[in-house]
């Protein structure tokens, strides 16, 4: 009878253990996200605060805030929806907010077409706190290696003829951790089944014939 392949079995076992651990971690993240969403719902009704100088605290999402953009340094556009549900291009400014610090990101409204920039030179902005656009790969979130997302201020009053930004919407906060957990558990189960079938076939196959004696 053939022996169980030791090294491949250890490698596959470790891979399965890692996938199961990631699934359990996603279930823990699901409970944490549910608590955060409840906090975001409360944030909508809380008093206005100054936009944070260190804009990476997710506990402030959906909180009313005010900040001063001394000057827009650069602009970028991202697709999105306006307050009426129409599609457009979000006009997002990277602002200088003071002598030091990371500055402030402000979404000033939506334009019907990409390109160009609003005729706006800065000023006081009131609105609510949201996440700035983020281009990190999804896989980093799945394995818990994503960097903290930067916050931005979504203006309540559009400028320069732009369409109004949407109001705070809790449905925009994804809580996909259960789906991610199921995926990891499925990956672990499939890997275990495939390896078990491969090992059984290997061990059940007849041994090669002995070489003829001379």
Please describe what each predicted stretch is.
Residues 1-214:
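Surface-exposed, charge/polar-rich loops and edge strands
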């Amino acid at each position: 009878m053939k022996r169980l392949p030791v090294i491949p079995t250890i490698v596959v076992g470790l891979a399965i253990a890692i996938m199961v651990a990631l699934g359990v971690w996603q279930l823990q993240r699901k409970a944490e996200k549910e608590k955060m969403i409840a906090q975001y719902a409360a944030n909508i009704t809380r008093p206005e605060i100054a936009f944070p100088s260190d804009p990476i605290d997710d506990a402030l999402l959906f909180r009313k805030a005010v900040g001063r953009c001394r000057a827009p340094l650069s602009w970028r556009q991202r697709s999105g929806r306006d307050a009426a549900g129409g599609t457009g291009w979000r006009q997002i400014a990277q602002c200088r907010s003071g002598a030091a610090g990371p500055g402030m990101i402000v979404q000033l409204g939506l334009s019907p077409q990409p390109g160009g920039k609003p005729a706006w030179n800065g000023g006081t902005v009131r609105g609510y706190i949201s996440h700035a656009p983020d281009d990190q790969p999804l896989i980093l979130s799945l394995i818990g290696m994503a960097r903290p997302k930067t916050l931005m201020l979504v203006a309540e009053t559009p400028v320069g003829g732009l369409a109004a930004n949407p109001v705070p919407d809790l449905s925009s906060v994804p809580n996909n951790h259960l789906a991610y957990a199921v995926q990891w558990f499925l990956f672990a189960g499939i890997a275990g089944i495939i390896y078990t079938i491969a090992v059984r076939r290997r061990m059940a196959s007849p041994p090669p014939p002995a070489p003829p004696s001379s």
